[in-house]
Structure formats: structure tokens, C-alpha cells
Regions:
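Conserved cytosolic headpiece of P-type ATPases
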Residues: 1-731, 736-739, 752, 767, ...
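Short glycine-rich, basic-tinged beta-strand/loop micro-motifs
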Residues: 764
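Conduit-forming functional cores of very large proteins
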Residues: 771-772
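A C-terminal functional module that forms or caps the active site or interfaces directly
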Residues: 800
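Alpha-helical transmembrane segments of multi-pass integral membrane proteins
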Residues: 79, 746-761, 791
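Juxtamembrane membrane-interface segments at transmembrane-helix boundaries in membrane proteins
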Residues: 287, 775-776
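Generic alpha-helical transmembrane segments
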Residues: 709, 754, 782-797
Length: 877
């Protein structure tokens, strides 16, 4: 049964209730049948489950497998388990970091509980009682007054000028005038949620008047419950970063297996086949392959993302999921709620048309029930009336002062049939004046006069036509227009019936108001466009208002680029996917429309973000690649399903967050390239050494370089500033691989250069001690190769500050990188010079001449890369 299309008496009959409410016994039976009026709680992952999720990452699985194989190798060869301990320490630290960041998030659907009213006034056994809201059942009669939160969905059975704020549910900033009457079907044979004026919904708030409603839905059977269900059904999808790292993990897995196979085969060819040589060669191959895995990569990525989270929080963007940092950087579509996100969610008077503006402001403020709070200086009450009272106060007419001068002595309250209200006042000179405000067309029907040049003149057709023309011009700009009039009395009228008061009025003027756009939003949207990001406005508000706001902000240039939810219902999913680029403003939409819009963009392969503050935004926020909630005006529901929360509710903060996301991703690629080039050099060095027949470096040496020497500079690269044109470029293609843009070639070329320098240093190290040029097992050569590889990596980190730009032309300095280079150099020197460390690593003493040679070889990487970058810049590769 569609209650809003049925007479309330039919609804009472359907619910087997009456205007006196249910009996206590019947209510108790229904509570057993329907359950409590509460929303199902979302299941929260335990700390252990979150920890295990971190361990299921493919990169981490590779490390765990490496640790297991290292353990087996150490056990069979009777060696130390140091490698195992080091690798598992990396795994655990990485998982703890991930859990720590994401454990800051609150439970998602449980927050919906906080929106429901704590207690409700209900008729039971014909008497008014106050109950906990979770005890309500279908058929209960709920009494609603200004300030009450609506505890359940219901059909209105009694209404006295009741207005309800439904912005959190529908997105409309203007309170809805509620009625008892039956609604009429539209062309779509239904009535949108925001137009169901004879219904009340859980999660909304009564801001004016009073009424009664019969409960038609509780708990998960409310509109709020439908949203909660949609949230629980929405599935989390892998982010672009997760996809790329998974691809990288597969590549590394294949590479490691390949290394094992090649080294094992070469070892057997050289040593011959026997049980002993098979086992020993296999253990050597596996241990070297394990050591060649970039053990620090997962930790570096996690820490760089964590640093990005910290930086974003300083810019008022609170990240709830680490991977959201990178996703922001490739966002192509931002679907934004209008109310409270693009606009201020505060009705504001922006225009007057009056002969006497001071009189107009006085009339509007006095003929209102909103009050000016002395502490905050802001009006409190129904939003439209608050706008009028605030406007008067802003222009030197605070309502408390006006009320002292103009005592209210009579009134005819507002009702939705008349569309106006009247108040009668005694003036400072003891005269009686009546102010009437309301809908312009209704007020003008009752006006016999108009104020012109300070004089009261007859209301002619010409004057009326001029007023209506001004009214239309304001309405065409999506302003909500109210008209004020007055009537003078010789004495206080004893009859305050509207029919008696509201006639022979004198027109005073028009006030136009709107929920204004945030002042910084237009510039933020322009920045989004420069960054190749398309802003989309989605709202539950009327189409005319949405079009006006959209055109003012530059989101659309023509009304044809706007579409309503009802029109959207007439388009199939397939057709909508093809036509979605035609529309940038969506009006009169419901929650399911928002999810559909997000899914249509995603179906076209676009990385889509959704911002919003109301409960109605939550399902689409969860469906989007990145959901952005509002920290101040946002409901807990929205915040808890969002990937990012704007602490200042400022749309412009998104631009800063996008820039930070792009910076973090670019820096992460630099760090990944740096680490992989180092590991490739290690792999190639081991491969060539094995082919020739000597051991260049031991697994423990490689672990030290991977986790100590390389990690500090790699982390510091994550702190590089944004490139100057980062927000002038289009978002990168989310489908592009981790090695896109020539990174694969860069890794290979740099790995080859470093390999050549390391092999040369090995020969030089052996030659400087033995006087012979040869490739043989040599502790001196190994020590020299280790020192040179470490120093080359330290110097190469400078090259990685910019993948294509010359390091001598960078405008910024990275003091963290300089510190990281120094730390790596000190630790590298310590492991060679400190006796017990040198003994553990089987290093031989190094003199100053050898240090100078190693440093000279290391520095060569800088001019080599400068030449390569210059060629790449010239060729555009």
C-alpha cells in the first residue's frame, strides 16, 4: 500500500489502528511481531580480522613465503635465522601500520542509530505517553511538535502549519510544508520522496508547527532502513593502487621463480648432478632469489601513504582508508551534493525590491516567529524566517529591539492553504499596524494599495503587473520570493480571523532568498576543470534551483545539461551509460538515483568520487571509488562510509586533497622505481657472477641494502613536493600499469648501469688487494661491491627526485632526503668498520683509497642519468 496515495482513514484501517492509538496490549504484541524500531547494526571487523586482512596483501604473501623458504634454508644449512627474523619483522610492522591507520574509522551503519530520536510522544490507550523511540510499532499515533526528531515513517493524520526539515534524507534545504490531504499522481504514476507532503520520515526534524501521524514503517522498513540495507549490500572494490601493486606482485613472483630456475640450472651445470649438489645448489638459488625481493617495498608504500594521510589532515582532509590517498590522484569525476557542500545550507536574503527597504526588512522580521539568539547573533527557528530575521539584523534592525518598539498584540498564524501569516503590532507612537507576509501571488490578491515614493497609491493593473514581473525575474534566478504588506488600524482588531485581517492590504515589497553557494566553491570547480576533473552536481532540490546554482558555479552552461530523477527513471541503464556525458546537474533525485549515476560513470571506466553530507548520500558514497563526507554538517552515517572526510566542509579542500593525492602517487612511483632498479641491479649482479662462477654478495648483504640502505632514501622520496604542473595535467589513466610512462625502461636501464658499476667495483676491490684482475671469490671484492652498491643507491636517490627533470634545476630542496642519505651512509660505513658487524657480514677492512674509488664510481650515476634525462626530454619519452 502506498500510504501517501491513500486517505489517512484508509491507512488507519490498514494499520488496524485509530486516532486514539493502540492499546498497550496490542502494541506489545506488535513489538514482538515487528521487532524494535531500530536499524540493523553493521558487523564490525575485529582487530585480529583487520590484521589478517593486511597479511592477505599479495606483496606481503611474497614476503611470508620468502621468510618460510629462508627458514628452511637456514635449518638445512645450520645457519642463523636472522633473515627470517628480519623479513617477518618487516611483515608485522607493515601490517601494524595499516591496521593503525584504518582502525581510526568508526563503525559504518551503527551511526544511523544516532539519528533516530531517543524518545517519542505517543497515544496509547487514548492517552499521551512518552516512550523510547525503539518501542514504536506500526499503527502507533505519534505526536510531533517543533524541535522533535521524527522517530519513524508515518502518514500524517493531523497537521497545523507543520514544516519538516528533510535535507538529510532528500537533499532539499527548504523545509517541507506538510499536509493531511491526498496526493495526486504525476506523469510517472508516482510521487517522489521529496514531494510526499502527507508523510513523515525517520531522521527528519520538525522545525515549525505541530501534527500527528500514524506509524507505517519502523526499523529497517523505513526509508532510512532502505538506505542502511543499501549500505550493507554495497561491495568494496579494489582501488587502482591495489590493482597495480597486485600486478607488481605477480611480476615479482614470476621474476623470483625465474631467478631460482636459472641459478639452479647454472649451478648444476657447473657443479654436476648429485643428491648433495642438487640440495646445496637449490638452497643457494632460493636464498639468493629471496634476498632479491624488495622487502622494503610494501613498508615504504604503506609509510608514504601514512605520511600523505598526515599531510592531508593538516589540510582538513581526514583520510579513513590509506588507499584513498592514491585514488584521489586519479579521480576523473566528482559527484557532489548541492546542499551544504556547494551551498551553505543556510537560506539567505540576497535581494530586495521595495520603495522603502527599511520598512520591508522591519515587516519581514516582525511578521516571523524566528528569534535572534543573543549569544550567537544568529536567528533560531524555521530557516526561511531565520533568513529574514538575520537580514534585518545585518541591516541594523535586530528583532529584539524591533519587538520592544513594536509590541505584538495579535496574529493569524501561517497555514499552507493561505500561504501567508499576519501579525498585529502597537507602534512607538501608539498606532496599530498589521504586517502580512507570504507568497507574492496570494498577497497581491488581497492588496488594494501599494507604496510608491513614500505614498500609498491604488493597486492598479499596471502596478500589479510590474510587481509580478519583478517576482518572475527573481524566481527565474531560483530565488525563493516572499512578499510583505501592511494594514493600518485605528484600534487593536478584536477579530483575528484571516478573512477579517487579510484584506485591503498595502503592498510593501519583495524579498528574494536562496541557499547561497560557498564563496570558495567557484574557484575550486575551476581548478578541478584545469586538473581534468569533471564536477557533477546531484541534488534532491527542484530543477530550476539546481540549474541556477549549476550555471552560477560553471558546472553547466545550458539548462539542457540538467535532468531530473523522474526523467532518469525513463532511461534504461544501457542508454544512460551512453548518454551520461550529456548531463552535469541532476535534480529531484532519490538515493537509488545517486548510486545509479555513480555506477554509470564507473561503467565507462571513470574513477568517480562522491561528496555529500546527508544520509541520502551514504549509499552512493560507498559505491563510489572514493567517498567524501562532510565533517561539520555531515551525518555520522556519511562520515563512517566515506573514504575521506572534509573537516571544514569546504569543497575547495577536495582540490588540495587531489593535489596531495597526485603528489603522493608520483612520489610513490619514484620510490618504487628506485627500489626496483636497485633490486634489478642485485639480481643481474648475482646472475652474472653465478654465470662466471663466483659469489659477489651474500643474501644477508642484499637484505641490509634492501631494508637499510635503500629504505631511508625511498621514504624521503615520498616527501618530495608536487611538481609545478601537477594540477594542470589530466588525471592519469587508472588502467595504466605501474611501469607506464617509460618507467619499465627506466628501471631496466638504471639497473644495468648500477650492475656495471658494481661488477667493476668487485674487480677493482680484488685488484687493489691482490694486484690481479680476475673474477674469483674474493672477500675484498665482496666488501667493495657492497660499499659501491650502497653508495650508488645513495647517490641515485638524488636522481630520483625528478623522473625527467635535471636535479640541478629543481626549485625546491628535500631536507629529509639529505638526512636519509647521511643516515644510510653512516650505517653502511658502520657495518664495514665496526668489528663485530664486519665479522658478522664477513667484510674485510677498507682503506681511504678504496672508499675514494667506491665514491667515485657511485657519483658517476649522476652525470650518466643527467645525460639520459636530457635525451628523454628532447625525444619526449
Amino acid at each position: 500500500m502506498k500510504e501517501y496515495l491513500s486517505d489517512y482513514e484508509e491507512v488507519l484501517k490498514e494499520q488496524q489502528s485509530s486516532e486514539d492509538g493502540l492499546s498497550s496490549g496490542e502494541a506489545e504484541a506488535r513489538l514482538d511481531k515487528y521487532g524494535k524500531n531500530e536499524l540493523e547494526k553493521g558487523k564490525k571487523d575485529s582487530l585480529f580480522k583487520r590484521f589478517m586482512k593486511e597479511l592477505s596483501d599479495p606483496m606481503i604473501i611474497i614476503l611470508i613465503v620468502a621468510a618460510v623458504i629462508s627458514g628452511i634454508t637456514a635449518f638445512y644449512e645450520g645457519e642463523s635465522f636472522a633473515d627470517v627474523i628480519i623479513i617477518m619483522a618487516v611483515v608485522i610492522i607493515n601490517a601494524v601500520l595499516g591496521v593503525f591507520q584504518e582502525s581510526k574509522a568508526e563503525a559504518a551503519i551503527e551511526a544511523l542509530q544516532e539519528i533516530a530520536a531517543a524518545t517519542s510522544k505517543v497515544l496509547r490507550d487514548g492517552k499521551q505517553v512518552t516512550l523510547k523511540s525503539d518501542e514504536l510499532v506500526p499503527g502507533d499515533i505519534v505526536i510531533l511538535e517543533a524541535g522533535d526528531a521524527v522517530p519513524a515513517d508515518g502518514r500524517i493524520i493531523e497537521c497545523a502549519s507543520m514544516k519538516i526539515e528533510e535535507a538529510a534524507l532528500t537533499g532539499e534545504s527548504v523545509p517541507v510544508n506538510k499536509i493531511v490531504d491526498l496526493l495526486q499522481l504525476n506523469s510517472q504514476k508516482d510521487v517522489p520522496l521529496g514531494d510526499r507532503k502527507n508523510m513523515v520520515y525517520m531522521g527528519s526534524t520538525v522545525v515549525y508547527g505541530r501534527g500527528k501521524a500514524v506509524v507505517t514503517g519502523t526499523g529497517m522498513n523505513t526509508e532510512m532502513g532502505k538506505i542502511a540495507k543499501a549500505l550493507s549490500q554495497a561491495q568494496d572494490e579494489a582501488t587502482p593502487l591495489q590493482i597495480k601493486l597486485n600486478q607488481l606482485s605477480k611480476i615479482l613472483t614470476v621474476l623470483v621463480v625465474g631467478i631460482c630456475a636459472v641459478i639452479f640450472a647454472v649451478g648444476l651445470m657447473r657443479a654436476g648432478i648429485s643428491n648433495e649438489t642438487i640440495l646445496s645448489t637449490f638452497m643457494v638459488a632460493v636464498s639468493l632469489a629471496v634476498a632479491a625481493i624488495p622487502e622494503g617495498l610494501a613498508a615504504v608504500v604503506t609509510i608514504v601513504l601514512s605520511i600523505g594521510v598526515t599531510n592531508m589532515s593538516k589540510r582538513n582532509a581526514i583520510i579513513r582508508k590509506l588507499t584513498a590517498v592514491e585514488t584521489l590522484g586519479c579521480t576523473q569525476i566528482i559527484c557532489s551534493d548541492k546542499t551544504g557542500t556547494l551551498t551553505q545550507n543556510k537560506m539567505t536574503v540576497v535581494e530586495h525590491v521595495a520603495d522603502d527597504e527599511k520598512l520591508l526588512e522591519t515587516a519581514m522580521a516582525l511578521c516571523s516567529d524566528a528569534e535572534l539568539d543573543r549569544d550567537s547573533g544568529e536567528a533560531v527557528g524555521e530557516p526561511t524566517e531565520c533568513a529574514l530575521v538575520n537580514d534585518a539584523a545585518k541591516n541594523g534592525l535586530p528583532k529584539p529591539e524591533l519587538e520592544k518598539e513594536y509590541e505584538r498584540v495579535g496574529e493569524a498564524p501561517f497555514d499552507s492553504m493561505r500561504k501567508m501569516m499576519s501579525t498585529v503590532h502597537r507602534t512607538p507612537d501608539n498606532k496599530i499596524i498589521q504586517f502580512t507576509k507570504g507568497a507574492p501571488d496570494e498577497i497581491l490578491k488581497r492588496c488594494a494599495y501599494a507604496l510608491r515614493d513614500g505614498e500609498k497609491v491604488p493597486m492598479t493593473d499596471q502596478v500589479r503587473e510590474e510587481i509580478l514581473k519583478n517576482n518572475k525575474a527573481m524566481a527565474d534566478r531560483a530565488l525563493r520570493v516572499l512578499c510583505a504588506s501592511l494594514r493600518e488600524w485605528d484600534d487593536v482588531p478584536q477579530n483575528t480571523e484571516p478573512e477579517y485581517l487579510e484584506k485591503d492590504l498595502t503592498y510593501v515589497g519583495l524579498s528574494g532568498m536562496i541557499d547561497p553557494v560557498r564563496p570558495e566553491v567557484k574557484a575550486a570547480i575551476e581548478e578541478c576543470r584545469e586538473a581534468g576533473i569533471r564536477p557533477i552536481m546531484i541534488t534532491g532540490d527542484h530543477k530550476d534551483t539546481a540549474v541556477a546554482i549549476g550555471m552560477e558555479l560553471g558546472i553547466i552552461s545550458d539548462p539542457s545539461q540538467a535532468i531530473t530523477g523522474a526523467q532518469l527513471d525513463d532511461i534504461s541503464d544501457e542508454e544512460f551509460k551512453d548518454r551520461i556525458t550529456e548531463f552535469s546537474v541532476y535534480a529531484r533525485v532519490q538515493p537509488e538515483h545517486k548510486v545509479r549515476i555513480v555506477k554509470a560513470w564507473k561503467a565507462r571506466g571513470m574513477i568517480t568520487a562522491m561528496t555529500g553530507d546527508g544520509v541520502n548520500d551514504a549509499p552512493s558514497i560507498k559505491s563510489a571509488d572514493i567517498g567524501i563526507g562532510m565533517g561539520i554538517t555531515g551525518t555520522d552515517v556519511t562520515k563512517n562510509v566515506a573514504d575521506m572526510v572534509l573537516a571544514d566542509d569546504n569543497f575547495a579542500t577536495i582540490v588540495s586533497a587531489v593535489e596531495e593525492g597526485r603528489r603522493i602517487y608520483a612520489n610513490m612511483r619514484k620510490a618504487i622505481q628506485f627500489l626496483l632498479a636497485s633490486n634489478l641491479a642485485e639480481v643481474l649482479s648475482i646472475f652474472f657472477a653465478t654465470m662466471i662462477g663466483f659469489t659477489i654478495l651474500q643474501p644477508v648483504h642484499l637484505l641490509w641494502i634492501n631494508l637499510i640502505t635503500d629504505c631511508f632514501p625511498a621514504l624521503a622520496l615520498g616527501l618530495e613536493e608536487s611538481e609545478p604542473d601537477s594540477m594542470k595535467r589530466k588525471p592519469r589513466d587508472p588502467k595504466e600499469g605501474i611501469f607506464a610512462g617509460g618507467m619499465g625502461f627506466d628501471v631496466f636501464f638504471q639497473g644495468v648501469i648500477v650492475t656495471a658499476l658494481v661488477l667493476l667495483s668487485y674487480v677493482l676491490g680484488h685488484r687493489m688487494e691482490s694486484g690481479v684482475w680476475e673474477f674469483v671469490n674474493s672477500p675484498d671484492g665482496t666488501t667493495m661491491a657492497f660499499l659501491t652498491l650502497s653508495m650508488v643507491e645513495i647517490c641515485h636517490s638524488l636522481n630520483m627526485r625528478s623522473r625527467r627533470g635535471s636535479i640541478f634545476k629543481l626549485n625546491s630542496h628535500n631536507k629529509f632526503l639529505y638526512g636519509a642519505m647521511l643516515a644510510s651512509l653512516i650505517l653502511t660505513t658502520a657495518v664495514i668498520e665496526v668489528p663485530f658487524l664486519a665479522s658478522a657480514f664477513q667484510f674485510t677492512p677498507i682503506d681511504l683509497e678504496e672508499y675514494a674509488v667506491a665514491l667515485g664510481l657511485a657519483i658517476l650515476i649522476i652525470p650518466i642519468m643527467e645525460v639520459v634525462k636530457a635525451i628523454q626530454r628532447k625525444t619526449g619519452k
